[in-house]
From Swiss-Prot:
The record marks 334 as: Transition state stabilizer. This is Ribulose bisphosphate carboxylase large chain. Substrate binds at residues 123, 173, 177, 295, 327, 379. RuBisCO catalyzes two reactions: the carboxylation of D-ribulose 1,5-bisphosphate, the primary event in carbon dioxide fixation, as well as the oxidative fragmentation of the pentose substrate in the photorespiration process. Both reactions occur simultaneously and in competition at the same active site. It comes from the Eukaryota. The keyword Lyase applies.
Amino acid sequence: MSPQTETKARVGFKAGVKDYRLTYYTPDYQPKDTDILAAFRMTPQPGVPPEEAGAAVAAESSTGTWTTVWTDGLTSLDRYKGRCYDIEPVPGEENQYIAYIAYPLDLFEEGSVTNLFTSIVGNVFGFKALRALRLEDLRIPPAYVKTFQGPPHGIQVERDKLNKYGRGLLGCTIKPKLGLSAKNYGRAVYECLRGGLDFTKDDENVNSQPFMRWRDRFLFVAEAIYKSQAETGEIKGHYLNATAATAEAMMQRAECAKDLGVPIIMHDYLTGGFTANTSLSHYCRDNGLLLHIHRAMHAVIDRQRNHGITFRVLAKALRLSGGDHLHSGTVVGKLEGEREVTLGFVDLMRDDYIEKDRSRGIYFTQDWVSLPGTMPVASGGIHVWHMPALVEIFGDDACLQFGGGTLGHPWGNAPGAAANRVALEACTQARNEGRDLAREGGDVIRAACKWSPELAAACEVWKEIKFEFETIDTL
């Protein structure tokens, strides 16, 4: 160290433990258009003021550490630090606060969801001053959005590839999800696709197990796709899960799918990781493959009301990283999803511009600056009686996925698929005629049963099935 540097450091440096409020709590700060904004739900430890807790979150997720260090004098902390610029109590909750934090854009690597999450949530959730912490929402500025490719193709390009317009898409997860041989698996795929579905799907934990190696599955499924296309005259697809133990193996599976000429593959983006997902998304765009994304493991992260990361943040991250489909919850069925919150997820996935709306959990206005949209996928315990509600809630730009609601049909897979297709088209036609599906949906389904024995049989089987549990994440 030169004498000049040593003297300067000694003059400006005073050792000691930091009071975060002095540096990182800045209530007069006006966020810039280029700042990344975060809304954290904090539960401070007893005796910790919310201002200190909010400042600590800003510090530990940006430039701060627990003590003063002499190297602070070698850069401009004022330029790079996160700032807690507002704190508000959570109505009806004791000792919970929403802390709003602004991060300068220079803190983040361009086009990297991995770096974004490592910075904002990578370390601060273990901070002792907090009993619990939840990332409620992020505002991604247009300047940062533009550094991402986003979904490989998006909703409109997908419809053009499939030549399917004016209705939602239908899918089905093959069951049992584990244990079938590759040939029997392909047979189940064929029956569903020839019956009227647009897609079938690998379950999220179908990779390359001893009972069915991935290459065998890919070959038999491709045969099923081509055979069903020849019979129906429609383009068909199956979400071939490319998730693997290594990124290299994942890309090998994606390349095999491309060589087979199938239209779509699949990835488990949370268990597989954002870096792998972004690489796969780039490959899919370059090679004309659609990319279906499963959110396996999401409830570990997003289900608790006061700790973790909300799914709206995970959905934004996926739209940046890249995926043409993403499971979003259903509102109806067996898996959790409160209506307004779920619709907030759906809008963030599909729309170009979403206004702030706290009633739906949206803390910031989000401008995606024409980044391609991601199609929401509704799945989990749904059947033909849910179809009117699903069409009314999700509209046309969604994939409605009936697993047991297809394969559980008393006459087999193909009749189960036909029942779902008839129900979807009947509900879509009724909506287009101006009928209120919320009130008349049951009548629409019953009328369609008169000319579809497959639908009538399905309605009889599932007429009493309900999943009535209170949702956890309500606003």
